[in-house]
Amino acid sequence: PPRSTLFPYTTLFRSDCGAPTYLMPLNQMATLFAKLASGDNLEMERIVRAMTHHPELVAGSESFDTEVMRLTNGEVVSKSGAEGIQCIGRVGEGMGLAIKARDGTKRAKYAVAVHLLKQLGWLSPEVSEELAEKYMVLSEYKRLDVQGDLDLM
């Protein structure tokens, strides 16, 4: 397909890591991660394979993305983005999700991601527990107060 069909957005921005990126709505991000993870396209499958076989090169050795891809043995592909964005795809299933923390921070997006992945059945109970211990911990200065919306596309 022509480039304009794949990438209808023309405004370029820079992510936190400096990589050029397009401004797009969350439903488009989720759709793109579903396509990325689907296995229907050889080029995208190669990207997913590279990400899941070497997750530490995606975001560093101790990052959420690396831990999710490593602990799920490559069944989930994950990439954190700037301003509270988190995109995740179920490898081989053609399913994707995108999360946006309204305040632009990481505080909630990882906890939301772990919760959604558990609810969707994308994580085993053991992996879910391990990720929850690290990313869903409340302290005396934190509370679980749900704010925002959840839309399924």
Residues of each region from the PLM?
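Hydrophobic (often cysteine-bearing) scaffold residues that line and stabilize catalytic clefts
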Residues: S4, P25, K109
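General structural signal for secondary-structure boundaries
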Residues: F7-P8, P25, S124
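Single conserved hydrophobic/aromatic residue that forms the stacking wall/gate
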Residues: P1-T11
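Short, contiguous, pocket-lining structural segments
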Residues: R14-P25, G39, E43
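Sparse, context-dependent recognition of short Cys/His-centered cofactor- or disulfide-binding micro-motifs
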Residues: F7, R14, T72
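Structured C-terminal helix/loop/strand segments within mature extracytoplasmic catalytic/sensor domains
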Residues: A34-M153
